[in-house]
Design a protein with these regions (language model features):
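Basic, alpha-helical nucleic-acid-binding regions used in initiation and control of genome expression
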Residues: 1-72, 79-170
Length: 170
């Protein structure tokens, strides 16, 4: 049982920085989607223009700047929908269901499954996973439905993000 009086439920600056870096890394495969897939993305016109500009840049320094810019803009968009759209475009359907099954299997009290996930997806970190699962447990503890929905969406997006990033590194 978790003693909630001893838990600091603030998100650390390090975790926020890691989340921003993941979004920046994901902007590259997002920009390399086909025109048809890009049109289907649930995003604002401004974001789409910046994303398409990233696809056209060839200079390494300019590309790095634009990648950071698109990563920052992803925060202002509905990032969960963008990640889901990229995930669905990136993986075949069989693999999608296999990866998404982790969402139900992961549990804060099951360290073995947590370690197995981190071993399979090298882009993930055990501490980050633990923090996401801790938020779900905290939402259960406080019986906050809105926090629960947000925490589950964050976990699902994290699983998708690290699956894509791990696959990019192969």
């Amino acid at each position: 049982m978790i003693d909630w009086s001893e838990e600091d439920m603030r998100v650390s600056r390090t975790e926020l920085k890691k989340a921003h870096e993941r979004l920046q890394q994901l902007s590259i495969p997002l920009a390399s989607l086909s025109k048809k897939q890009l049109k289907a993305l649930p995003a604002s016109d401004y974001f789409m223009a910046e994303l398409m500009a990233l696809a056209d840049i060839t200079s390494a320094n300019a590309r790095n700047r634009q990648t950071k810019r698109v990563g920052k803009l992803m925060i202002e968009e509905n990032r969960h929908e963008l990640i889901k759209a990229l995930f669905d475009a990136y993986f075949p359907k069989e693999q999608v269901s296999k990866i998404e099954s982790w969402h139900e299997r992961l549990n804060i009290n099951d360290e073995g499954t947590l370690k197995q996930f981190v071993k399979q997806y090298q882009a993930s970190e055990q501490h980050s996973m633990y923090q996401l699962l801790l938020w779900i447990e905290y939402a259960k503890h406080t019986q906050d439905d809105e926090l629960m929905a947000e925490s589950k969406a964050d976990l699902a997006s994290y699983i998708r993000e690290v699956a894509i990033l791990t696959n990019l590194k192969k």
